[in-house]
Structures are given as C-alpha cells and as structure tokens.
Amino acid sequence: MALDKSIVVNFTSRLFADELAALQSKIGSVLPLGDCHRLQNIQALGLGCVCSRETSPDYIQIMQYLSKCTLAVLEEVRPDSLRLTRMDPSDNLQIKNVYAPFFQWDSNTQLAVLPPFFSRKDSTIVLESNGFDLVFPMVVPQQLGHAILQQLLVYHIYSKISAGAPDDVNMAELDLYTTNVSFMGRTYRLDVDNTDPRTALRVLDDLSMYLCILSALVPRGCLRLLTALVRHDRHPLTEVFEGVVPDEVTRIDLDQLSVPDDITRMRVMFSYLQSLSSIFNLGPRLHVYAYSAETLAASCWYSPR
C-alpha cells in the first residue's frame, strides 16, 4: 500500500477569486512547512516566519530554515484549503518551473531550493482574505545558487569594511560586481538594498572570520609543497596557481616545519571547513532527470543535502 504523504493546510477564511487564481498558477511549486503533520494551519506555510515584510531579510537564516523544515509540492488549491505532497528523501516528484524571476531548467541538472534573493515581493502572494503573506522560495540551477552566495559573501565583507572606513571601499564598484548575476545571457539584480547591515547576513560575519582563520591555519607543510611544486615539477595544474600565490606565502620561513603543529592546524582547519560547508552545500537539492520546456514540468528526485 502506497504511503499517503498528503498535507492539508486550512485557511481561516475563504480565498478571494484573484487569490485563488494566483495560487492555482503556483501548482507544482515547492513550499516549506513548519513540520510534517497531516493537518496544518496557514501560519506554518511558506517563508513568512523568517522573511516577513516587517523585517530585513537575513538570507543565511532563511537557508538554515530551508535545510530544517518540511518541504512539499503544491498539488491542489481550493477556496478553503491547500493540498500538498510531502517530499521525502529519494522520492520521485513532479514539480513545475513557476517562479519569478524565471530561470530555464533542463534535464539532468541539479536544482537548489533557496531564499527569494531577487525580490521578496515577486515571490509573495498576499492573501488579504486571511491577513497572510505566502512567501515562496526560489528553485534555481545549483550553479546559479553558488554564484549568488559567492557574490553576497563578497558584498557583505566589503560592506563591513566600508562601515568602519568609508573611504577604503569604492561602493559603486562593489555594487557593479556583486549585486548582479548573469545566467544564460541575462542579468538579474540581487535584493541587497532592503537588507539591514546591522542584522542581515549576520551569520556571514562568522563565515568571513572562518575564511580569515582558514588562511592562517593552512599547514605549513602544504605551503612548502605548493612552492616546491610550482618551482620544480611544473605540473600543468600547479602552473594555473603560480600567478595567484600571495607574496606573503613566499616570505614564510618554511624551514621551521613542525609536524605536531601541522596536525593541530589540519584538525582545526577541517572543523572550520565543516562549518562553512553546512552553509555552502546548497541543500536541499532536486535532481532533475526529465524536463519539458513547453509545460515547464520536471521529473526529479529529492535529496535533503
């Protein structure tokens, strides 16, 4: 007997006609839920609990919520309720590409479920009948998700520098290179204007510090090996890195090597790498094996990590 994975979300009031039509256009989309219970209320649906209109978005906090919550596919919309199908690991699913902005999917690709990086407004259906904003996540190709996170991290680092020393950062240049991403010939602007620098992306403060610490934790033996390979073996792969080895690396006293010290460095470095990977692995993921550009429907299987 097949396991019933249906989740029913009841509204507090019947939907208006335009709200009903807007939600029906989103059938096939992925929505987060606070838990996996069969019957839930509307307050548990969507990203409104971590991405409300009253607060500035903290995208890393939203990503952490997406990694812990229950995900489901919107299957049916009625005037008084929604029906969704819970997504379990390795499940085969049918979803649709009904997100704004629109990014083309294709077969044999990986999709990431991410916060609404480009516009909370465009990812929200306002249900005035229920006094509730239903905020949808984005489902985008994984390589685009990586590009977004990389640019947000650089933007945040330089914004912090500018807060302490405004003359040290060319904000026009920072805006040009970090607030826009290109994908398949089109350019999209990230929603960084509405973030509060005092709270938004606060987890990236730790991540930025982790990156700085990692640069100091690289075992000295690794640096010695790097310089030896670049200078002598001339392997094609090491030639790629020859031009980007910082000058300070060549000035380190590599003759003072210590195996116990390098073991400690390696152990701590792995600890910080695991902290970084918990953010940057872009879980959860959807592995698409069939996609129709005409119907925007995709067949995929689900991986929480």
From Swiss-Prot:
Primary location recorded for the protein, binned into one broad class: virion
Protein keywords: Capsid protein, Host nucleus, Virion
Cellular component annotations (GO), alphabetically ordered: host cell nucleus; viral capsid
Subcellular location field: Virion; Host nucleus
Superkingdom: Viruses
Pfam families in the record: Herpes_V23 (PF01802)
GO molecular function: structural molecule activity
Family of this protein: Belongs to the herpesviridae TRX2 protein family.
Function statement: Structural component of the T=16 icosahedral capsid. The capsid is composed of pentamers and hexamers of major capsid protein/MCP, which are linked together by heterotrimers called triplexes. These triplexes are formed by a single molecule of triplex protein 1/TRX1 and two copies of triplex protein 2/TRX2. Additionally, TRX1 is required for efficient transport of TRX2 to the nucleus, which is the site of capsid assembly.
Database matches in HAMAP family: HSV_TRX2
Subunit structure, interactors included: Interacts with TRX1 and major capisd protein/MCP.
Name of the molecule in the record: Triplex capsid protein 2
Naturally occurring in which organism (per UniProt): Human herpesvirus 8 type P (isolate GK18) (HHV-8)
